[in-house]
């Protein structure tokens, strides 16, 4: 009986903490994504990616 109550409480904690953690991570991720895809950074990232690809192809 005590095990069942503990299990229920544990599930409730996970259920409660899960969405808020996911929401926090997605919020942080989307703000980072929008920061990186804003115009100057997009150019910088694309140019650095192209440069590294070019260097790997030359090596």
Swiss-Prot record:
The keyword GTP-binding does not apply. Its EC number is 7.1.1.2. It catalyses: a ubiquinone + NADH + 5 H(+)(in) = a ubiquinol + NAD(+) + 4 H(+)(out). The chain crosses the membrane at residues 32-54. GO terms for cellular component: mitochondrial inner membrane. Core subunit of the mitochondrial membrane respiratory chain NADH dehydrogenase (Complex I) that is believed to belong to the minimal assembly required for catalysis. Complex I functions in the transfer of electrons from NADH to the respiratory chain. The immediate electron acceptor for the enzyme is believed to be ubiquinone. This is NADH-ubiquinone oxidoreductase chain 5. The gene is ND5.
């Amino acid at each position: 009986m005590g095990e069942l109550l503990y299990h229920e409480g544990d599930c409730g904690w996970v259920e409660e903490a899960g969405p808020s953690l996911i929401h926090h991570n997605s919020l942080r991720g989307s703000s980072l994504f929008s920061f990186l895809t804003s115009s100057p950074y997009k150019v910088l990232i694309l140019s650095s990616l192209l440069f590294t690809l070019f260097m790997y192809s030359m090596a």
